[in-house]
Swiss-Prot record:
Residues 22-38 have a biased composition (Polar residues). Its main location: cytoplasm. It comes from Rhizorhabdus wittichii (strain DSM 6014 / CCUG 31198 / JCM 15750 / NBRC 105917 / EY 4224 / RW1) (Sphingomonas wittichii). Residues 100-150, 210-229 have a biased composition (Basic and acidic residues). Residues 156-196 have a biased composition (Low complexity). One of the essential components for the initiation of protein synthesis. Protects formylmethionyl-tRNA from spontaneous hydrolysis and promotes its binding to the 30S ribosomal subunits. Also involved in the hydrolysis of GTP during the formation of the 70S ribosomal complex. The keyword GTP-binding applies. Residues 390-394 are annotated as: G2. GO terms for cellular component: cytosol. This is Translation initiation factor IF-2.
């Protein structure tokens, strides 16, 4: 374009007589993509004739920069050079502009600048739209070329492989001759030079020579530069001689294919997959969405339409979940949380699988009637001498082999009243109950309770009348006393067997064994040993070196080392089995008591043990049972908590907090039950924590927060716990006999309540006259009706049988003399402390207060 063809700047200005100032915009480009737009002006100046010898005046154009160039082409182009600045022209000497002309000129310049800016913006927008359209078209064209190239490459490779198989002799020369033809058919557009294209790869056994890396393309304009490494060999580059052209990546090809696939499937309706959704009693919205394979937002939206504003983390009930499942077209399958638990009541063994098993015999009776001594005589051991206080405080399980070769399993239960739950548990897991009655003591409360437990369990009983070696023993008196409780022995025409024994002299033991074997034969005790084991926890402890240890009485099946089991809310794997003699065994059959190691925690006595198939199932069942226990505890808490706070508000009940630690779970139950029984309406025992094992630092910290003592039953505190207890002032109380424990706790609770005060009324008098007593206020003239009135006694005034004053007598006079005491039938005058509200006819009662030590 020549200089004459350049468009003039500011041609859109209106015509006028004034000199015009042509303006425009020039875009300056810098490195790193920076640019700047400059407004330029073109002024015409007239040069007046100068001195002689100077050139003729001529009109020149002075520009600051070149006008705005059109949009650059995609090909790289150099930046337009800036025109050289001419020499400065002399200042014109014409007349100066008036203010009106100057203002018009400024307005015109502003208008022209705005028009130029708008034109530049419009041009920029058109240029961007053009570039976008070209890029879209280029992308579509390249995708089409790549697709055709891939198809041609596949066809060429297949044809080359077929040709190589048919002509085996010329397999090496044929590819070089046919390479130009194959390359020519691979592309529809003409190529620049076929000799520069590398030969295509042939699928022949001959190894192809190493292909040289194509040269790096020249620097392109940023709009045309793909900014990718060009050393990667692709199918398109192998079949295309234009190695510098941009090639699409594999990810871009995959995206394009997915887009085409979605476009083809847009017209077809996909079939919704109907699922069977298992819905428990409560489920979160997010979990329900996962089971339905739906989006959680869709479920939340559906619930909002139902009027339930919830989030994906909130729980909904089973009925609401059913509405959602039905609305989304799925099938609901209602499940209950209890389905997770093990159900063994319906599991009945076939008759042909049953084999005889030893009987389980429980020894029950009153404390100190000789139960453990009798069992020691049967076993040939001496357990009773090693027990604290000479009383049994745990359930002991033993298996004895008698002279006939048969085996009998014995359970020794405590006789103290605090161990009622242990005796009831022993009666429920036994086959035969032997009730021991001392011949010199007769029937006692725990003996009667043992008879009741036996009847409730529905098991047969045998009466063993012990201590027959003592001079004062009378077996006939015991038999007659049993009749009062509907127990008729065989010697008196009944069906209950009885035997007279002496554990000390070991007499009558053989007869007792014979009666047990006879009763067991009548019961026909059988069990299936070839099945997963089931049993009952007799006792559970926490050993410092072995961890949680439970004594299990196997009911049916065979418990083996390595079995995975669930017991109550605990699970575990059998690491060791120890029998009653302390020997490690590999397996335990029916009716055999064993200690098991490997529990995750200490179970409760009486929990059922069941062997399961794997650890996941065991953890699932244990977690469900723990949740049930926690739910029961939390749901029962509000009522008791509310009643406790209401009692505290009314100052009716005090709290005596304690922390209980014992050596066995059964002992914990007995202690907690006994402490709750000694609570009264005035003071109640609050169990902060009750557990099995030694006293630890956490127990001391818990007790220190509530200023509570720690009760250790057959356990001790470690060194660190003792140090913290001394520092925080926590009382550590150790016991090994439950009698002493209950007596001391009862005394401590009574001491916290303080002494009780009893009132004894000693006199009654009637006020006959009221008169002034100077500084004492008012004095009352009395007639003593009953008893006596003494100075400094406590007194109360009653008016119409309502107490209106409670205080003490400050002075007592008869006539004008102070007297210490006035008896019935005499008159006197008194003044009372801090009251003047007395009238004739009121009754005065005097009483003494007796302080007495409180007992529970």
């Amino acid at each position: 374009m020549s200089d004459n063809d350049k468009p003039k700047l500011g041609m859109r200005a209106p015509l006028g007589l004034k000199r015009t100032v042509e303006t425009g915009q020039v875009k300056q480009s810098f490195s790193h993509g920076r640019s700047n737009t400059v407004v330029v002006e073109v002024k015409r100046r007239r040069i007046v004739p100068g001195r002689p010898g100077e050139a003729e005046p001529q009109v020149t154009e002075e520009t600051a920069a070149a006008p705005v160039a059109p949009a650059p082409a995609p090909a790289p182009a150099a930046q337009a050079p800036v025109a050289p600045r001419p020499a400065p022209a002399p200042i014109p000497t014409g007349r100066p502009m008036t203010p009106l002309e100057r203002r018009e000129q400024q307005e015109r310049l502003l208008r022209e600048a705005e028009e130029a800016r708008m034109a530049a913006l419009e041009e920029t927008r058109r240029r961007e739209e053009r570039a976008k359209a070209e890029a879209t078209e280029e992308e579509r064209r390249r995708a089409e070329e790549n697709r055709r190239a891939e198809e041609e490459a596949e066809r060429a490779a297949a044809a080359a492989a077929a040709a190589a198989t048919a002509e085996a002799e010329t397999a090496a020369a044929a590819p070089r001759e046919e390479a130009p033809a194959a390359a020519g058919t691979a592309e529809e557009a003409p190529r620049t030079s076929s000799s520069t294209m590398p030969p295509p790869r042939r699928f022949t056994p001959v190894p192809s020579p190493k292909r040289p890396e194509p040269p790096r393309p020249q620097q392109r304009d940023r709009k045309g530069d793909d900014r990718r490494q060009s050393g990667k060999l692709t199918v398109t580059r192998a079949l295309d001689d234009d190695s510098g052209a941009r090639a699409r990546s594999l990810a871009a090809l995959k995206r394009a294919r997915e887009k085409d696939k979605r476009a083809h499937q847009a017209g077809t309706v996909q079939q919704k997959q109907v699922r069977d959704v298992a819905v428990p009693e409560t489920i979160t919205v997010g979990e329900l969405a996962n089971r339905m394979a739906e989006r959680g937002a869709d479920l939340v939206k559906a619930l909002f339409k139902m009027g339930m504003p919830v989030t994906v983390n909130q729980s909904i009930d089973q009925d609401t979940a059913e509405l959602l499942v039905t609305e989304f077209g799925h099938n609901i399958k209602r499940v209950s949380d209890s389905d997770v638990d093990l159900i063994t009541s319906d599991d009945v063994d076939a008759a042909e699988t049953l084999q005889p098993r030893p009987p389980v015999v429980t020894i029950m009776g009153h404390v100190d009637h000789g139960k453990t001594s009798l069992l020691d005589a049967l076993r040939g051991t001496d357990v009773a001498s090693g027990e604290a206080g000479g009383i049994t405080q745990h359930i002991g399980a033993y298996q004895v082999q008698v002279k006939s070769g048969a085996k009998i399993t014995f359970l020794d239960t405590p006789g103290h009243e605090a161990f009622s739950e242990m005796r009831a548990r022993g009666a429920n897991i036994t086959d035969i109950v032997v009730i021991v009655v001392a011949g010199d003591d007769g029937l006692r409360p725990q003996t009667i309770e043992a008879i009741s437990h036996t009847r409730a369990a529905g098991v047969p009983m045998i009466i063993a009348i012990n201590k027959m070696d003592k001079p004062g023993s009378n077996a006939q008196r015991v038999r007659e006393a049993l009749l009062q409780h509907d127990v008729q022995v065989e010697s008196m025409g009944g069906d209950v067997q009885e035997v007279e024994v002496s554990a000390l002299k070991k007499t009558g033991l053989d007869e007792l064994i014979e009666k047990i074997e006879l009763q067991a034969e009548l019961l026909e005790l059988k069990a299936n040993p070839d099945r997963p084991a089931e049993g009952t926890v007799v006792e559970a402890t926490l050993d410092k070196g072995r961890g949680a240890v439970a004594t299990i009485l196997v009911g049916r099946g065979t418990l083996k080392v390595g079995d995975i089991f669930v017991v109550g809310a605990e699970s575990g794997k059998v690491r060791a089995l120890i029998d009653d003699k302390g020997r490690n065994i590999k397996e335990a059959g029916p009716s055999l008591p064993v200690e098991i190691l490997g529990l995750s925690g200490v179970p409760s006595a009486g929990d059922q043990l069941s062997v399961v198939e794997n650890e996941a199932r065991a953890r699932e069942v244990a977690a469900y049972r723990a949740g049930v226990i926690h739910q029961k505890r939390t749901t029962a808490a509000p009522a008791s908590l509310e009643s406790m706070f209401s009692a505290l508000r009314e100052q009716k009940a005090q709290q005596y907090p304690v922390v209980v630690k014992a050596d066995a779970q059964g002992s914990v139950e007995a202690i907690v039950g006994s402490l709750n029984k000694i609570s009264t309406d005035l003071i109640q025992v609050r169990i902060l924590h009750a557990g099995v094992g030694g006293i630890t630092e956490s127990d001391v910290s818990l007790a220190a927060a509530s200023k509570a003592p720690i009760i250790g039953f057959n356990v001790r505190a470690n060194a660190k716990a003792r140090e913290i207890a001394t520092r925080d002032g926590v009382a550590l109380k150790y016991y090994d006999v439950i009698y002493d424990l209950l007596d001391e706790i009862r005394a401590a609770m009574a001491g916290q309540l303080g002494p009780e005060y009893l009132e004894h009324v000693v006199g009654r008098a009637e006020i006959r006259e009221v008169f002034s007593a100077g500084k004492h206020g008012k004095a009352a003239g009395l007639l003593v009706l009953e008893g006596y009135i003494r100075q400094k006694l406590r007194a109360r005034i009653m008016r119409d049988d309502v107490i209106i004053y409670n205080g003490s007598i400050s002075s007592l006079r008869r006539f004008k003399d102070d007297v210490p005491e006035v008896r019935a039938g005499l008159e006197c005058g008194i003044t009372l402390e801090a009251t003047t509200d007395i009238k004739p006819g009121d009754i005065v009662e005097t009483f003494e207060v007796e302080e007495r030590e409180r007992t529970l």
